[in-house]
Amino acid sequence: MNILRKIVKSCKDEEDQKPALVSAPPDDDDLWLPPPEYVPLTEITGKKNMRNFCVNGEIKICSPNGYSFRILRHILKSFDGVYSGNRRMIGLVKVVIGLALSGAPVPEGMNWVYKIRRTLVFQWAESRGPLDGEELEYSQEITWDDDSEFIGLQIRVSARQCHIQGRVWCINMNSRACQLWSDMSLKTQQSDEDKNTSLLLE
């Protein structure tokens, strides 16, 4: 029986591995940019529950025999049930996970590492989201382990409010990020004040 469970297993880099030949995507890589829902302050009509966050996210995948997004998606479909971080920021974490996994991984021994560092603008529905000035330091390992496959998913997300301005972003709505957000059941609703803006409900 396939069991999704939260356990701690170390995925250490192997020192005898050859140097990585794949580099990280450049900072301006469009694959890493958030969707139209998250736009700079100057483009947002309703600013009541808007927050600018400086975000650092890292997802490390440990799998001795490689991995497929089929298993990753299966793990993320249970994300609400295993998430151990601040519940007021679960929506932000889901967005960062989707964006990070849309980039290109950097191999580190037996691990594949996805990273994102961005200033993102979020809007939450009334009474939702983090408290003003609240910061997030979230770290968790979720492991899939059955008779045929092992995958360790190490997730780290840090987020703090900041005042750095951004630019208008867009992403293909059929992209991997949107697929992963759907898997994680990211909850949003269209803003009554701005038809181009979606509000996070979590």
Curated annotation (Swiss-Prot):
- Gene3D superfamilies (alphabetical): Rhabdovirus matrix protein M2
> Gene Ontology terms, cellular component aspect?
host cell endomembrane system; membrane; viral envelope; virion membrane
Question: Where is this protein primarily located?
Answer: virion
Tell me which UniProt keywords the record has, alphabetically.
Host membrane, Host-virus interaction, Membrane, Phosphoprotein, Viral budding, Viral budding via the host ESCRT complexes, Viral envelope protein, Viral matrix protein, Viral release from host cell, Virion
Q: Where is this region: Essential for glycoprotein binding?
A: 115-151
Q: Which GO terms describe its molecular function?
A: structural constituent of virion
Topology class, membrane? Peripheral membrane protein
Indicate the family of this protein: Belongs to the lyssavirus matrix protein family.
Q: What is this protein called?
A: Matrix protein
Q: Which species is this UniProt entry from? A: Aravan virus (ARAV)
Q: Which gene encodes it?
A: M
